[in-house]
Regions:
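Short glycine/threonine-rich catalytic loop with a Thr-x-Gly-x-Asp
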Residues: 174-185, 209
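Beta-strand->loop->alpha-helix junctions that form or flank phosphate-binding loops
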Residues: 1, 40-42, 120, 131-152, ...
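Conserved small/polar residues in nucleotide/adenosyl-binding loops
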Residues: 207-214
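Short beta-strand segments
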Residues: 61, 144, 166-170
Length: 214
């Protein structure tokens, strides 16, 4: 995976929880758009029936960045989402502080010209290189967030807010509350890399959850 991220624009999703859903949703948003992507996922995409998507003409590769055994330190992300940093794998890391330090080091690997999209409120203090933009996201606040959330009749509809745009009336294909926040992160990654507003809206509507992980 390290070689792949050095030879393409790696769009990596890291975090204790939510990375499989977020990376699979991001991959779907890219793959069904004019931008396209290759993707290596930690769960099976129900949209495509596989955890591997190929799009040779696209410069982008979506990857689930796994913190287990510090394997994500081999990556060279162009952009990365960090969803959560709740301590895990303490048999390897030993302490909460060592776990957070591993994520801090991971943020130093994001390449200049790229971006970090980090969930607002995490204990992690990023340490990005000069030239790396940092954005926050969450369900209700941050540079990227949701507004006008409507839940009922078996569906969730949101307005997606970005620093430079607003996409109204996005229907989430999987109407589960946590997918609002995961969806915001995936949409942020897509928006920053040229997926159009209408492609984001259509992609969210048609997205189905991965299996079995998260």
């Amino acid at each position: 995976m390290g070689t792949i991220t050095r030879s393409s624009k790696g769009l990596c999703v890291a975090g204790t929880h939510g990375k499989t859903t977020t990376s699979t949703m991001a991959a779907h948003l890219f793959h069904q758009s004019h931008v396209g992507c290759t993707a290596f996922l930690g769960g099976i995409s129900k949209n495509y029936g596989t955890n591997l998507l190929l799009s040779p003409a696209s410069p982008y590769t979506v990857i689930e960045a796994d913190e287990f055994d510090r394997s994500f330190h081999w990556l060279s992300p162009y952009m990365s989402v960090i969803t959560s940093t709740d301590p895990d794998h303490l048999d390897i890391y030993g302490t909460r502080e060592a776990y957070l330090e591993s994520f801090r080091h991971y943020t130093t690997l994001i390449q200049p010209g790229g971006a970090l999209i980090i969930r607002k409120g995490l204990a992690l203090q990023p340490d990005v290189q000069p030239g790396v933009r940092t954005y926050t996201y969450s369900r209700d606040e941050g540079d990227f967030h949701a507004e006008n959330i409507r839940i009922g009749n078996g569906e969730i509809i949101i307005d997606f807010i970005a620093p430079d745009t607003r996409i109204n009336d996005i229907r989430l294909g999987v109407p589960i509350g946590i997918n609002i926040e995961n969806g915001v992160a995936a949409m942020a990654l897509a928006h920053l890399n040229g997926v159009t507003d209408e492609e984001i809206r259509q992609g969210c509507l048609l997205y189905t959850s991965p299996s079995p992980r998260d």
